[in-house]
Amino acid sequence: HFRKKKATQRRLKMSSPYRAEEEEEEDDDASGVSGNEEKNARWRRLYEHKLESLLKEPSVDYRHSAEKLSILVKSGLLEFTDLTRNPERFFLAHRLLVRKGFEQGPGFSIRFTVEYNLFGGTILELGNERQKLNLQKVRERGELGCFALTEKLAGVNSGLIVQTTCTWSQREKRFTLKTPSENARKVWISQGLVATRAVVIAELIVRGRNHGPHAFLVNMRKQRLGPLNPNIKVGDMGDKTTGNDLDNAWIEFDSVKLPYSSLLDKHDGIDVRTGAYVQKNTALGMNERHLTNMDRIGQRLYTGRVAVAQGAHEFRKRLFYKTKAFADQKETWNFSEKNNGGEGMMDKAVDIAASNVTNKRFGGRRRSKYNTTSAETVATELVSHVRGPPLSQVPQLRQLFLVAKQQEMKMDAFLVNVERKLCISLRKKERASKSLVDAIAAAKILAVEDAIDLTHRLRQETGSYALMAHTGFEHSDFLICCKFAEGDSRILELKLARDRVKTKNPNEREPERVAREKLIEGLRADQAQGMTIQKAWRRRWREAYELAEIAARAIVDDWNEQADAEHNAEQILSRL
């Protein structure tokens, strides 16, 4: 094991000079905090320089985009193991990518999170030591992977409904991976057309018994850019409103034979001598042993939800920044009548404009009594143009920029706190606490919903600018993608509401109490009339979403207040 570890370190140094340098600095460990800050600053400069070169020109198509990511992966600037060893670096890398690629659309940043978090992260979470070591070879070759979870029938219930099967044959000592119907087809698989490997979620069948969803590492091709392996079919989901530099595929498996080594079996596997299903790591605590593989995959979804929240937040920040820069230099104008006796001249100009519109509407047969064809010309004759304030100072737009900035600062602070707590959990390889899980859900819900709302309002106030390419508005459907990615926000809202109904929040504020009691009273009234609890929840969907939003905003306020209190305490202690 020691020799393998040293060999891996030597290969790492040869494949990534930057990483080798960093490892040596860690071994020395003499520079302390300031040394780490300098190292991180240097990494950021190198990473941003790499992004500048890769994103200098937009990708021609999804293959071009995939090649760019392959180059980034191969550079070694970000390792798969950074997800647990240095998770702050992963989150920063993603945020920088969203900022740098703002004008080019969201495809590349989505591709990035699939490669590192969903594909690589799942192998780190569920794979054995050999499988995790092989990730390094994947990185060195610049191979791309995908994460095949969502199925056609399941929709937003990904993981809860899995029909793809993987059946173990003790006689053959192999699995058979099968898509039993079109409804079981994997759909919307990002990077699915170009992936060399795929983490596929399928029901594990052993001796006729279904052991639930497990993860399998499937070779889609023998080598990067090579033809698909036999009995694997893929197709394009079709053109999208944005992000067409990202391939979204459907995938089918027609009795694909897999070796035992394809099963990610860190926690659960098969005794190949007897063919029995076995649970490993029996030394773990009771709570840890009872986790399913889907529970463990959920750890990746927590990381992904924070990344999605940050991506949506960064997108709308960049959109508002760029739009305000335009609005600050965009002049507006006022009318000043040329003579004091010109009272009503502006009304006259308006009448002329209306008359011309009427003439055009009826084919121009009726001539205006003002004998003119241009309302703009007449208006110029009647009045003089006076420079007004910039567009950004128009009252409604000025107010929108102010509101957006206030929300931005609050969400910035909250996302920093959530990322910090999640990174601590990832480093310690601990399960996320209930409080952290709720905070991650609140971040995903509110960062995305606020971005959608503010972007829509901004579009209404900026005229033709919002219709132009290269403004960012053309990619705003990315925010809709964020709403449904890594856990549908509506599902997260319903879970938050159900949890609040089931267990009262000990830090409950008055608005949350009122909303919770209103929902409970409605549910009870419906049940008293003979309605099932499921139907009652469907009927009270408005009250449920209202409670969820209030609860989510209360979580943001609570976390920010707690962070402020901790910061103040640290300042007092430092003075002492």
Residue ranges with predicted function:
Residues 188-189, 226, 250-304, 322-351, ...:
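A glycine-rich, basic-preceded beta-loop-alpha segment at the flavin cofactor/substrate interface
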Residues 122, 184-186, 484:
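Sensory/regulatory domains in signal-transduction proteins
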Residues 227-256:
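Flexible, small-/acidic-enriched active-site or ligand-binding loops
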Residues 342, 346-348, 355, 381-425, ...:
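Extended, well-ordered alpha-helical scaffold/bundle regions in very large, multi-domain proteins
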Residues 170, 174-233, 250:
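A short core secondary-structure module
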Residues 10-146, 156, 170-176, 349-352, ...:
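Amphipathic, small/basic residue-rich leader segments at the start of a protein or domain
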Residues 455, 473, 489-565:
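Ordered core of a single globular domain
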Residues 434-511:
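Alpha-helix capping/hinge segments and adjacent helical runs
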